[in-house]
Amino acid sequence: MAALAEEQTEVAVKLEPEGPPTLLPPQAGDGAGEGSGGTTNNGPNGGGGNVAASSSTGGDGGTPKPTVAVSAAAPAGAAPVPAAAPDAGAPHDRQTLLAVLQFLRQSKLREAEEALRREAGLLEEAVAGSGAPGEVDSAGAEVTSALLSRVTASAPGPAAPDPPGTGASGATVVSGSASGPAAPGKVGSVAVEDQPDVSAVLSAYNQQGDPTMYEEYYSGLKHFIECSLDCHRAELSQLFYPLFVHMYLELVYNQHENEAKSFFEKFHGDQECYYQDDLRVLSSLTKKEHMKGNETMLDFRTSKFVLRISRDSYQLLKRHLQEKQNNQIWNIVQEHLYIDIFDGMPRSKQQIDAMVGSLAGEAKREANKSKVFFGLLKEPEIEVPLDDEDEEGENEEGKPKKKKPKKDSIGSKSKKQDPNAPPQNRIPLPELKDSDKLDKIMNMKETTKRVRLGPDCLPSICFYTFLNAYQGLTAVDVTDDSSLIAGGFADSTVRVWSVTPKKLRSVKQASDLSLIDKESDDVLERIMDEKTASELKILYGHSGPVYGASFSPDRNYLLSSSEDGTVRLWSLQTFTCLVGYKGHNYPVWDTQFSPYGYYFVSGGHDRVARLWATDHYQPLRIFAGHLADVNCTRFHPNSNYVATGSADRTVRLWDVLNGNCVRIFTGHKGPIHSLTFSPNGRFLATGATDGRVLLWDIGHGLMVGELKGHTDTVCSLRFSRDGEILASGSMDNTVRLWDAIKAFEDLETDDFTTATGHINLPENSQELLLGTYMTKSTPVVHLHFTRRNLVLAAGAYSPQ
């Protein structure tokens, strides 16, 4: 944003405060707490226009020690202060005290004035009779001048300041309090915050603005935007929602309850429909006491709302606020918004609507600039013995016929190193065991019989319906070889079924195992206890509903996550719990094994995702950044990244190596409930309660497709084994198949609009829909493609 710095027209003078420095609360979400010691805003002086929080010493963990910058202009409405020297003696002390009291009265700081007057033993009449407002004698002139060098002075000059994050700087607005510049003609106050974090956050709403003017301020801006040109109206309309929320919260915090109620009733209907859930929560905040325990309000306050606006639209807004001298709105723009300015044509209404909707606005362009290794790791070389009958398609059961072994050509499919793949040793992965190699051989054999899907060859769908599931089915998973299916239930149990004729058996007791010949060829069969054989195993251990389940790639283990805040690892050899992983403070909504095993990820109500290893009791990484519950988690095919979907309506991609967030995707209008990566690792599909499926290019961090058709929450997404078909399952009792090849073809990513970080989405989602398959009355909870590209779906029958 260096180019914007050329707009600076005035220079602020920085003075060390004579008293103890005012500690401003760090701006969470913009680098606070990283030990920079400076402000969290971008641009010159630590903030575009607001230089009051510029630090004089660094390294304080993100809490800035501010110097105070004084505007060259006098505060509007204040009388000029003569520079006469004070007289000596006791009269001077009295005059000084009266000058301070007069200053507090002019600033409408009645409580401070009353406390100081009582302490000095002065009568009310003495203060009232010391002179009319603005008439300060020479004895108090120096004191008043000194005070003015410490406090907030807001001077509506010829040019309005730019908001933090834009990098531009106009006329300097000086802020010595957490609330930013005061109203026109007022001198603000210095506020020292020694309160807990919540109080420090809420104190930003402590201002002296006229509550009766809020409706006029908002109506004036609304009228200006609605009367602007069409090309600017869509972009400037993004201001409505964040300004509405912050103005309402200011009124509530300052106990103007009637004005707040009137303001909400008048303007809440003007907000976009996808913000209605947030507005319902906001409407319940009618008193100052309600704000301290409300997470939604704190989220909105501590994270700057991001708006992406073209330079032309921004200049139009800047001129309007300059002419109207609307400092109340400009204060909110400075303190709570991050305006990301780009050069180029303003975006259309359609482009903006496709990207907005999250709790904190759009993602900053810088958030999606990191390099992502989305390629696949090189597969190990394994010789696959193929029979002649297998090649001719005669051996349907895939059993070896003891023919002469041959090398499978498909074994060399991924032998070439992908240029976009991470280094093989970027993160330590478990070594392949002999059983893993055998499983890969079976997988490659199945691949030779895989059906090639497409618009003219759609897959068959096998639906597993859970009947009489009065325990409440909450989670489903299927093993990679499609031999086992697990269900998590609200009665805190996990149930495992065999979907093949082979029954589930436990390992024999230790006393019986000692009698087995370990050198025999069928030792793996002999260790199993036939007396325990059954089609169903029930696992007990959780103390709350089970919300997530995931099989390990080798089918030896099962993970389950629960409302009790734990993730449990179950052995599928003994059907007992091996480990309970404790780290989450609240319910754990989802968990998933890495494609290579060993690692797994979990996400829950505490707004963080955690990376674990099966042999560690504590998490290896904590992925923190979401503003609401982490509803779903998914490993990238190369295991170097983890995707998380949240109730804050964003999707984040995390680097397993260092725990950094490398991608933030916004565009959903409801909480995200499903994620899946394409088999080549380049694309990500996400589904949410808004019924839409969005497609993302991971390498460029851009939305490349939008699939509309579902009328309820999209609970499950899965690509076919070769990536030709995308299947989606929803609470609307349907499975839909989409043409993934057509959705991603002809994407010239090099021609993406770099200025806006967005492309024009093709309006052909119905053309991409290949088929819709309805169930009788069963929401689709889980989808799975077998190794031969047969679709398995699962859900619990719920009669209307």
From Swiss-Prot:
Pfam families noted in UniProt: TFIID_NTD2, WD40
UniProt feature, compositional bias: Basic and acidic residues: 407-418
The protein's name: Transcription initiation factor TFIID subunit 5
UniProt repeat feature WD, residue ranges: 468-507, 541-580, 583-624, 625-666, 667-706, 709-748
Ranges annotated as biased composition (Low complexity): 165-189
Cellular localization per UniProt: Nucleus
Gene3D superfamilies: TFIID subunit TAF5, NTD2 domain, YVTN repeat-like/Quinoprotein amine dehydrogenase
GO molecular function, one term: identical protein binding
Residues covered by region (NTD2): 194-340
GO cellular component, one term: nucleoplasm
